[in-house]
Amino acid sequence: MEPLWHKLSALPFFSSRPEKWEGSGAPPSLTAFIRSLFKGKALSLELYATALTHRSMVHDTTAPEITRSNQRLEFLGDSVLGLIISEYLYRRFPEGTEGELSSYRAKIVNGKSLAGFARNLDLGIHLIIGESADQQRIRTSTSTLADAFEALTGAIYLDRGLDAVREFIEEQIIDSPAFEAMVSTENNHKSRLIEHTQSHQLPPPVYTVLSEEGAEHEKTFTIEVSCNGRRLGRGTALRKKDAEQLAAEEAMGALERALTGDVAEDTPAPEETGRG
């Protein structure tokens, strides 16, 4: 059976897609786009072409040989994405209740959020859509983009395995600026610590990595936070951001105790912290 990739490449519309889409500029080669996700490593183009094939292609009379869309990969990717995000939240919030973790996950794994991550990748311009379909509407549709992101996740899992798809999710979701807003709210101890130091006219907190232990893919980071040269707290976690949050949480606890008179040893009150 001829690979889907070859079939798509031979279609007239595939080589003559519009040169630009609203706000996206000229789309690069689909092959180059896929390879760019993994720093040029060899990939199964067949699998990724399927992940980016919209269901309208299956019904396109100009391409009767195309019988598969990305819907099955979307189904798989939804589960893989849910697993990786659930595992991350479980580790990041060891005291979080089932309800709290579910609430965080719902903010991350939903159509609107996933469509935003898809837009960051310019996924819309790479979708393979039926010639008779409303291409511009489909390429910018929230549900279509979310589905494509899930399908891409499923393709990465089948092609590269769990570690590779976890790395992809970390880069595209967990390390994105929008992610912290989804899981932080009142638990953003770093923001609380900054607000506290500013209100007492102190220098901003400084985070220092004290140690990195373990294998490359399972490192544990210990980070210390200080202000004006005085240690305020430290935290240990599998990710630097999480260790910083734990250090800031400990620092806030110490500072709050200092303000109420319950001062722990080696933890000065804010006024004392600012002295030379």
UniProtKB/Swiss-Prot annotation:
It comes from the Bacteria. It catalyses: Endonucleolytic cleavage to 5'-phosphomonoester. Residues 188-257 form the DRBM domain. It is found in: Cytoplasm. Mg(2+) binds at E74, D147, E150. GO terms for cellular component: cytoplasm. Its cofactor is Mg(2+). GO terms for molecular function: double-stranded RNA binding; metal ion binding; ribonuclease III activity; rRNA binding. Its EC number is 3.1.26.3. Residues 30-161 form the RNase III domain. Homodimer. Digests double-stranded RNA. Involved in the processing of primary rRNA transcript to yield the immediate precursors to the large and small rRNAs (23S and 16S). Processes some mRNAs, and tRNAs when they are encoded in the rRNA operon. Processes pre-crRNA and tracrRNA of type II CRISPR loci if present in the organism. This is Ribonuclease 3. It comes from Chlorobium luteolum (strain DSM 273 / BCRC 81028 / 2530). The gene is rnc.
